[in-house]
């Protein structure tokens, strides 16, 4: 552990770099149709120019230590993109409509739409509670949760379902190999999936009636549940355990219609329930001790990889030989590491939480704020100056008491 400890000067350099990246990625303007003044952090200026739902939530949580006003504005801008019925899209284009090939591969009904017709993991109310205050007092968040319950709860147990791998935020994760198969990986299968969902309006029930696939995905529901808890709504943790917990393997796995083919991969989604404040301790300890802290699986030099290093699907390549998307099939990401870190703190694994923070801090010090990292070497991968990777500072908090932790353990 001693050799992992970052000097205070290194922490300060990381802190300063996080602030520089957040500030340089900040965008603001006025919506042309109604004069709404928006402000958001683009994930990375070179690759991701728009506002992404879950990115904005993570970025607002990171912003709160540097500029609370921008943290709040980020979330209010996301809510400002809401439709009248409560829907909030995966991507908001803010006066920059889709062009070129993106018109065909993005989840939109029409290329002139102001947002995608797809969702992302709905953690806005949770982030709102961390950054701004009581989310249940905001009518737009109430409408958002009403929309999710009405349109995405397929089976009446409160859990929500997705119609595309991208709606999970985990894109081509190997947890979807037995569900969407080649349609999750890239062209041409992914184009077929987009066209099929577009014909059905990205509407869950017609898609399910047509044979799907549709999926009850773990990360999506963990973050949705955290938002529900922040709203004062009943917990979905019992329903999530009943539907997705594989007691024999000691991990959480996606449920789908049709049922997945083959043995589901063990991915970072399997550990995401660690972030839930009411996850039974015995389940949490199994996730930590049998999986997260196992060097052969998730406790790699830069932990945790997005797929268990012991899983046959583990790969650290950005792309496959034919352009398949691979970046959620092995590389380590800061946002999912942060969710695991929250669980370690909540369950009392403070030395392991500190070690995770130190390893990731050292990685960021060496490679910068990248989209994701090679979990064995720490090499930076993907986009440069990636905004949500500034969450590393929440893990480097010397007292292990970020605002998100206090919401989980108090």
Please annotate each region the language model reported.
Residues 105-133, 339-343:
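Hydrophobic/aromatic-rich effector regions of fungal transcription factors
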């Amino acid at each position: 552990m001693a050799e992992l400890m970052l000097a205070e000067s290194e922490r300060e350099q990381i802190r300063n770099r996080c602030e520089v990246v957040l500030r340089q990625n900040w965008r603001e303007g006025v919506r042309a149709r109604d004069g709404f003044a928006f402000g958001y952090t683009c994930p990375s200026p070179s690759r991701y120019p728009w506002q992404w739902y879950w990115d904005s939530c993570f970025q607002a949580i990171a912003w709160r230590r540097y500029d609370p006003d921008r943290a709040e504005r980020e979330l209010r801008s996301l809510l400002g993109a809401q439709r009248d019925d409560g829907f909030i899209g995966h991507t908001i284009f803010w006066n920059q409509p889709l062009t070129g090939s993106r018109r065909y591969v993005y989840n939109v009904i029409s290329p002139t739409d102001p947002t995608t017709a797809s969702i992302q993991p709905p953690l806005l109310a949770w982030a709102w509670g961390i950054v701004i205050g009581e989310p249940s007092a905001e009518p737009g968040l109430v409408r958002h949760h009403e929309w999710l319950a009405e349109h995405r709860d397929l089976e009446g147990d409160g859990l929500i379902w997705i119609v595309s791998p991208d709606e999970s935020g985990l894109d081509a994760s190997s947890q979807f190999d037995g569900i969407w198969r080649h349609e999750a990986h890239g062209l041409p299968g992914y184009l077929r999936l987009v066209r099929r969902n577009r014909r059905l309006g990205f509407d869950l029930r017609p898609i399910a009636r047509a044979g799907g696939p549709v999926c009850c995905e773990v990360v999506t529901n963990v973050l949705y549940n955290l938002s529900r808890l922040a709203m004062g709504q009943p917990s979905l943790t019992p329903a999530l355990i009943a539907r997705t917990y594989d007691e024999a393997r000691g991990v959480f796995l996606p449920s789908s219609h049709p049922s997945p083919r083959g043995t589901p991969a063990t991915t970072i989604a399997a550990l995401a329930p660690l972030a839930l404040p009411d996850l039974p301790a015995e389940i949490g300890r199994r996730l930590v001790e049998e999986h997260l802290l196992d060097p052969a699986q998730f406790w790699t030099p830069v932990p945790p990889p997005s797929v268990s290093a012991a899983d046959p699907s583990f790969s650290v390549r950005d792309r496959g030989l034919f352009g398949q998307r691979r970046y959620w099939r092995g590389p380590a990401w800061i946002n999912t590491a942060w969710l695991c870190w929250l669980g370690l703190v909540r369950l009392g694994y403070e030395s392991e939480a500190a070690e995770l923070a130190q390893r990731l801090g050292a990685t960021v010090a060496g490679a910068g704020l990248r989209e994701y990292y090679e979990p064995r070497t720490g090499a930076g991968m993907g986009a440069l100056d990636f905004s949500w990777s500034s969450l590393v500072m929440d893990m480097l908090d010397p007292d292990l008491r970020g605002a998100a932790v206090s919401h989980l353990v108090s």
